[in-house]
UniProtKB/Swiss-Prot annotation:
Source domain of life: Bacteria
Protein name (record): Dihydroxy-acid dehydratase
Role, per record: Functions in the biosynthesis of branched-chain amino acids. Catalyzes the dehydration of (2R,3R)-2,3-dihydroxy-3-methylpentanoate (2,3-dihydroxy-3-methylvalerate) into 2-oxo-3-methylpentanoate (2-oxo-3-methylvalerate) and of (2R)-2,3-dihydroxy-3-methylbutanoate (2,3-dihydroxyisovalerate) into 2-oxo-3-methylbutanoate (2-oxoisovalerate), the penultimate precursor to L-isoleucine and L-valine, respectively.
Pathway info: Amino-acid biosynthesis; L-isoleucine biosynthesis; L-isoleucine from 2-oxobutanoate: step 3/4; Amino-acid biosynthesis; L-valine biosynthesis; L-valine from pyruvate: step 3/4
Cofactor remark from the record: Binds 1 [2Fe-2S] cluster per subunit. This cluster acts as a Lewis acid cofactor.
Gene: ilvD
GO molecular function list: 2 iron, 2 sulfur cluster binding; dihydroxy-acid dehydratase activity; magnesium ion binding
Lineage: Bacteria, Pseudomonadati, Pseudomonadota, Betaproteobacteria, Burkholderiales
Keywords: 2Fe-2S, Amino-acid biosynthesis, Branched-chain amino acid biosynthesis, Iron, Iron-sulfur, Lyase, Magnesium, Metal-binding
The protein's Enzyme Commission number: 4.2.1.9
Family in the record: Belongs to the IlvD/Edd family.
Length: 560
C-alpha cells in the first residue's frame, strides 16, 4: 500500500511527466514517487540564538524521514528575534511573523501537495505560527522545538535574557556597578537555544507537548545537548507512521486537547502570550474556544512549577526534574487532564504517561497538586469598563494582585521607558500604554523593556502597568495586557486621562476606570481615531486585517 495520498497528484500519470522531471533534477529516482513527500519547515537562522542551532535538527529530520521510508523536502520559515527587537519599532513585526510563518507552512504544504510536515522552530512566534500553519493545512504533522538555552553564569548566579532587562533598571537607579552591568550583558546568553525561563518559547513548546503535537520530553531539552538530535530522528519516524495512519492535526487538536495544553500552561506558570496564541490556534483548528475558557481552566488548575520569571528555576531544570510528562502525570492523577485525548504518537495522553514515574522526592522544581505554589492558575482574565472583551493579568509573584492608583498615560513604549528611567514613575502609579494593540501598534508589541526597568528599580509590585499591547513571557509584576477593545478601535482605554483613578483587582477579576458613565460619554463624543501609522507594506496589511486581541489577533477572521 502506498501512502502518497496527496503527492500522487503531482507525481503520477502521463500528464505529470514535467513535474517528475523537476524531481529528477533534485536526485529523485523512479521508485521515490510512490513514497510520501514529507515537508521539513526549517526555521534555522543566524538572526537569533533561538534559531541558530536548528540546522542540525533539520538534518536529523531528513535522515529520520529517509530511514522511515519518506522523501524529505526542506523549505524555510522566517523568524524575528523578540529579544533583539524588544523596545524598538522592530517589535511591531514580531506578531506579524506569526502570521507569515503560518502562511509559509500552509502555502508550501498546499502548493507542493505534501503528505506530511515537520515544523522546526525556536523563537517565540515560530511555535504558534507553525502550529497554525499545520492546522490550516491539516496533513499529518509534528512540531519539533529547537530547544532551550543553558543559563549564563556570573558570580555564582544563573543568568538569562531577563537578567539583562532587569539590570538596565538596576543600573539606571544606581543600584548596580558598571562592571557588573557589563558582565551580565556579556554572559547572560552563552550559546544557542531559546530564552531559558518559562517565557513564551518554552511555554508554547511545553503546551504543544501537552496538546499531543510534539513528542514526550521533547519540549524542555537544551539545544546544545545531543539528546535533542536523537529525539528529532525518532520524531521523524513517528511522523511517517502518522502519515501511514492518516492521523491529522485536527484529529488531535480538539477542545479537550486545548484544555490539556492550557492546564499545563497554568501548572508551569507560563506566558501571557499563550492566551493570544491559543485563541489563534483554536481558530485555525476550527475549535470553539474563547478567552473565558482560559479563566475556566485557570480556576481548577494549580501552579505546580517554580519557574522563572517569577520563580526560581529554568526550563532545563524542569527537564532534569522529569519534564512535562512529570507535570502531566501529576495533573492526570488528580483528574485535571483529559487522558483520552489522541496524540501524534498514535497513543492517548494516558497511554503516553502510563510508564512515567511519580514526582521524585529529590527535586523541588515540580510540586504535588496537594502542595501547590498557588491553588489556582496565574493567568487571570479580567473584565470591566476598561476591557469589556477581557484582558490578561499575570498574578504570580505578587504579594497582593490588587491596587488602585492614578493613571500615567503614554501613547508609545519609548516615552514610558524614558519616564521610568528618569524616576518620574513612583509607587502607586498605574501606567497606561495605549495605541499598541493589533491595529494601533500595529502588531501588538511586547512591553518587556518598561516592565524590566520597573522591576530593576524595585517598583515591580507597587506600580501597575496596563496596555492594549502584549508582554514578554519574561514579564512579571502588576501587569495587565491584551486590553480589548484596543484604543485604536475606540476602546475605553483611549479615553483615560492623566490622573484618572484605575483599579486592578485580580481577586474580583476587575479592570475598572473609576470615572462616571456620563464623563466617559462626554470624552467619547470628543474622541476621534488617529490616522494609521502605516499605509503600505506588511504592517499596514496587519493593521487592516487583524482581529481583536480577544479573538487572537488573527488575520483570517472575516465577517467579525
Amino acid at each position: 500500500m502506498s501512502f502518497n495520498r496527496r503527492s500522487k497528484n503531482i507525481t503520477e500519470g502521463v500528464a505529470r511527466a514535467p513535474n517528475r522531471s523537476m524531481y529528477y533534477a533534485l536526485g529523485y529516482q523512479q521508485d521515490d514517487f510512490s513514497k510520501p513527500m514529507i515537508g521539513v519547515a526549517n526555521g534555522h537562522s543566524t538572526i537569533t540564538p533561538c534559531n541558530s542551532g536548528l540546522q542540525k535538527l533539520a538534518d536529523a529530520a531528513v535522515i529520520g524521514i529517509k530511514e522511515a521510508g519518506g522523501n524529505p523536502q526542506i523549505f524555510g520559515t522566517p523568524t524575528i528575534s523578540d529579544g533583539m527587537a524588544m523596545g524598538t519599532e522592530g517589535m511591531k513585526y514580531s506578531l506579524v511573523s506569526r502570521e507569515v510563518i503560518a502562511d509559509c507552512v500552509e502555502t508550501c504544504v498546499g502548493g507542493q501537495w505534501m503528505d506530511g510536515v515537520i515544523v522546526i522552530g525556536g523563537c517565540d512566534k515560530n511555535m504558534p505560527g507553525g502550529m497554525m500553519g499545520m492546522l490550516r493545512a491539516n496533513v499529518p504533522a509534528l512540531y519539533v522545538y529547537g530547544g532551550t538555552i543553558l543559563p549564563g553564569k556570573y558570580k555564582g548566579q544563573d543568568l538569562n535574557i531577563v537578567s539583562v532587562f532587569e539590570a538596565v533598571g538596576q543600573f539606571s537607579a544606581g543600584k548596580m556597578a558598571e562592571e557588573d552591568f557589563c558582565e551580565i550583558e556579556r554572559r547572560a546568553i552563552p550559546g544557542s537555544g531559546s530564552c531559558g525561563g518559562m517565557y513564551t518559547a518554552n511555554t508554547m513548546s511545553s503546551s504543544f507537548e501537552a496538546l499531543g503535537m510534539s513528542l514526550p520530553y521533547s519540549s524542555t531539552m537544551a539545544n546544545v545537548e545531543e539528546e535533542i538530535v536523537a529525539s528529532v530522528k525518532v520524531a521523524a519516524g513517528v511522523l511517517v507512521e502518522a502519515v501511514k495512519a492518516d492521523l491529522k492535526p485536527r484529529d488531535i487538536v480538539t477542545k479537550k486537547a486545548i484544555e490539556n495544553a492550557v492546564a499545563v500552561i497554568m501548572a508551569t506558570g507560563g506566558s501571557t502570550n499563550a492566551v493570544l496564541h491559543f485563541l489563534a490556534i483554536a481558530h485555525a483548528a476550527e475549535v470553539e474556544w474563547t478567552i473565558d475558557d482560559f479563566e475556566r481552566v485557570r480556576r481548577r488548575t494549580p501552579v505546580l512549577c517554580d519557574l522563572k520569571p517569577s520563580g526560581k528555576y529554568l526550563a532545563i531544570d524542569l527537564h532534569h526534574a522529569g519534564g512535562i510528562p512529570a507535570v502531566m502525570k501529576e495533573l492526570l492523577k488528580h483528574g485535571l487532564l483529559h487522558g483520552d485525548c489522541m496524540t501524534i504518537t498514535g497513543k492517548t495522553v494516558a497511554e503516553n504517561l502510563a510508564d512515567v514515574p511519580d514526582l521524585r522526592a529529590d527535586q523541588d522544581v515540580i510540586r504535588a497538586v496537594t502542595n501547590p505554589i498557588y491553588a489556582e492558575g496565574h493567568l487571570a482574565i479580567l473584565k470591566g469598563n476598561l476591557s469589556p472583551e477581557g484582558c490578561v493579568a499575570k498574578i504570580t509573584g505578587l504579594k497582593s494582585p490588587v491596587m488602585t492608583g492614578p493613571a500615567r498615560v503614554f501613547e508609545d513604549e519609548q516615552s514610558a521607558l524614558a519616564a521610568i528611567m528618569a524616576n518620574k514613575i513612583v509607587a502607586g502609579d498605574v501606567m497606561v500604554l495605549r495605541y499598541l494593540g493589533p491595529k494601533g501598534g500595529p502588531g501588538m508589541p511586547e512591553m518587556l523593556a518598561p516592565t524590566g526597568a520597573l522591576i530593576g528599580q524595585g517598583l515591580g509590585e507597587s506600580v501597575g502597568l496596563i496596555t492594549d499591547g502584549r508582554f514578554s513571557g519574561g514579564t512579571w509584576g502588576m501587569v495587565v495586557g491584551h486590553v480589548a477593545p484596543e484604543a485604536y478601535a475606540g476602546g475605553n482605554i483611549a479615553l483615560v486621562q492623566e490622573g484618572d483613578s484605575i483599579t486592578i483587582d485580580a481577586h474580583q477579576l476587575l479592570l475598572q476606570l473609576n470615572v462616571s458613565d456620563d464623563e466617559l460619554a462626554r470624552r467619547r463624543a470628543a474622541w476621534t481615531a488617529p490616522a494609521p501609522r502605516y499605509t503600505r507594506g506588511v504592517l499596514a496589511k496587519f493593521a487592516f486585517n487583524a482581529s481583536s486581541a480577544s479573538a487572537g489577533a488573527v488575520l483570517d477572521k472575516f465577517g467579525g
